[in-house]
């Protein structure tokens, strides 16, 4: 071998125009490149002449030796240069077309190199192992084509896993962290990739695309720790080594939790420790006490003053007492507004009707409110002292809310001449048509002078119905005194 090399090996070497390297360059310079600088020079700068290099399986250096020499460049000696020259000499005596190394193929060099860098943190990449195994069959056998197809599929699978892992990791970052990643990522992209990204952003902006809202980082999914604990051994072949590095950012104790799989108790303890560590790192500590309900922590938070029910009730009570023309003070008996209410009515008004008392004041104008206030005052003064304690009249807040909630309790509808002449229709407008038989024999002039005791004697047994009728009678009576009732109603 050495004699053949000394005899005609020099004459068979490629000239300077054919050589992929400069004349002054060391023959083993390609092996001294720590990354893909020399590989890119061979794959892109040499052009067609780079296609003459043989695969690593045909010379004495294996992929392990290449990786070892990249990690320790000082160990390169003259034997590596001689082996490279011998491989170039052997290439001239072959059939002319050899199987290229996958690391030097133009269409797969970038993918394989990037995948090797992503997967080489914990162990050797499965793609590189598959490449060596597939190329060991020889350049002429039919098994080499099958090996190449399997290698290409492995490269694409690993590349897809890398992309999915990177996208998943990016989605779990905050906006500031994503900006930092993009600043470092854009500086390493080619110009054509940047142009493509620019066009993509412009098209998305013109189409009205809105970026999806990021979920809060304060609550990482606790089940991810359990997944790492239980499926590390079963999914180690399908899961990339880089995924553990990306997931380890979530918790410092993920590795410790993944290794404790001796018993169920150990798994549960490590799982709870990992969850506590995650919540301690990303968000405030949650309520982990099972004896305390999850919603009890709301009592410790300072509530805004606008949401205090007690303040709202007190403010509404003061509004009724001070702002509504002192309706309750004009009753003359000094009884509290809710003295007639039972215990159940008070509970329901506090629980269900907490905010309903504010609504009745909206549909009424100040004029109608003044009229109703004055009419209720006049009516309360006309009542007898004996009837007032049992039935205080419609001057209470609950009665006023029930009356004003109806759209028909206004002077215009109550003083309609057509309705005043037809008492059943007038009662139907108040939704009290069930008492038409009891009040049908009287005119509206007689009805407005009735009091609570007379209505009860006439058959109006419901207290709410009597209050509603007395309120309507007071409004019609006030309109009559002011001359607002049409003459056709008489």
Curated annotation (Swiss-Prot):
Biased composition regions of type Basic residues, renumbered to the chain: 313-323
Q: Where's it mainly located? A: cytoplasm
For bias type Polar residues, the affected ranges are 76-90, 330-351
Bias (Low complexity) occurs at 365-384, 396-410
Q: Name one GO molecular function term.
A: mRNA binding
Question: Which Pfam family would be a valid example here?
Answer: SAM_2
Q: Where is the SAM domain?
A: 418-479
Annotated localization: Cytoplasm, Cytosol; Cytoplasm, P-body
Tell me which PROSITE patterns the record gives. Answer: SAM_DOMAIN
SMART domains per record: SAM (SM00454)
| Keyword annotations | Cytoplasm, Nucleotide-binding, Protein transport, RNA-binding, Transport
Single GO cellular component term: P-body
- Residues annotated as region Disordered? 1-29, 71-90, 305-410
Q: How does it assemble?
A: Monomer. Binds to RNA.
Function noted in UniProt: RNA-binding protein involved in post-transcriptional regulation through transcript degradation.
Tell me which family the UniProt entry assigns to this protein. Answer: Belongs to the VTS1 family.
Question: This chain belongs to which protein, by name?
Answer: RNA-binding protein VTS1
């Amino acid at each position: 071998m050495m004699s053949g090399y000394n005899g005609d090996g020099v004459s068979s070497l490629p000239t300077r125009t054919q050589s992929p390297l400069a004349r002054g360059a060391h023959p083993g310079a390609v092996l001294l490149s720590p990354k893909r600088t020399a590989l890119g020079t061979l794959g892109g700068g040499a052009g067609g002449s780079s296609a003459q290099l043989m695969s690593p399986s045909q010379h004495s250096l294996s992929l392990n030796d290449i990786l070892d020499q990249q990690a320790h460049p000082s160990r390169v000696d003259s034997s590596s240069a001689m082996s490279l020259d011998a491989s170039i000499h052997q290439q001239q005596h072959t059939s002319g077309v050899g199987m290229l190394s996958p690391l030097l193929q133009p269409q797969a060099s970038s993918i394989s190199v990037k995948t090797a860098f992503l997967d080489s943190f914990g162990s050797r990449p499965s793609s590189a192992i598959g490449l060596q195994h597939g190329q060991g069959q020889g350049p002429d056998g039919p098994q080499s084509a099958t090996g190449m197809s399997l290698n290409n599929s492995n490269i694409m699978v690993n590349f897809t896993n890398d992309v999915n892992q990177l996208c998943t990791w990016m989605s779990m970052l905050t906006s500031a962290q994503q900006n930092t990643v993009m600043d470092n990522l854009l500086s390493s992209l080619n110009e054509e990739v940047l142009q493509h990204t620019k066009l993509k952003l412009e098209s998305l902006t013109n189409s009205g695309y809105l970026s999806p809202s990021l979920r809060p980082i304060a609550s990482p999914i606790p089940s991810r720790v359990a997944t790492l604990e239980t499926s590390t051994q079963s999914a180690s072949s399908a899961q990339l080594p880089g995924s553990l590095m990306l997931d380890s950012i979530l918790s410092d104790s993920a590795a410790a939790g993944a290794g404790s799989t001796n018993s169920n108790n150990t798994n549960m303890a490590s799982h709870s420790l990992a969850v506590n560590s995650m919540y301690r790192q990303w968000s405030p500590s949650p309520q982990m006490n099972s004896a305390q309900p999850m919603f009890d922590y709301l009592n410790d938070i300072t509530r805004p003053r606008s949401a205090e029910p007690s303040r709202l009730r007190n403010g509404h009570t003061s509004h009724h007492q001070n702002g509504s023309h002192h309706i309750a003070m004009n009753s003359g008996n000094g009884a509290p507004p809710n003295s007639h209410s039972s215990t159940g009515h008070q509970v329901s008004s506090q629980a269900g009707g907490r905010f309903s008392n504010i609504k009745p004041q909206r549909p009424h104008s100040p004029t109608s409110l003044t009229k109703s206030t004055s009419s209720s005052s006049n009516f309360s003064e006309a009542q007898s002292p004996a009837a007032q304690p049992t039935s205080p009249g419609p001057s209470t807040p609950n009665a006023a809310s029930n009356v004003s909630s109806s759209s028909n309790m206004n002077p215009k509808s109550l003083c309609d001449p057509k309705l005043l002449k037809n008492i059943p229709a007038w009662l139907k407008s108040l939704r009290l048509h069930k008492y038409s038989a009891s009040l049908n024999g009287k005119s509206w002039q007689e009805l407005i002078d009735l009091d609570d005791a007379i209505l009860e004697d006439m058959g109006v047994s419901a207290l709410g119905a009597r209050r509603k009728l007395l309120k309507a009678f007071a409004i019609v009576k006030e309109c009559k005194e002011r001359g607002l009732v049409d003459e056709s109603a008489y």
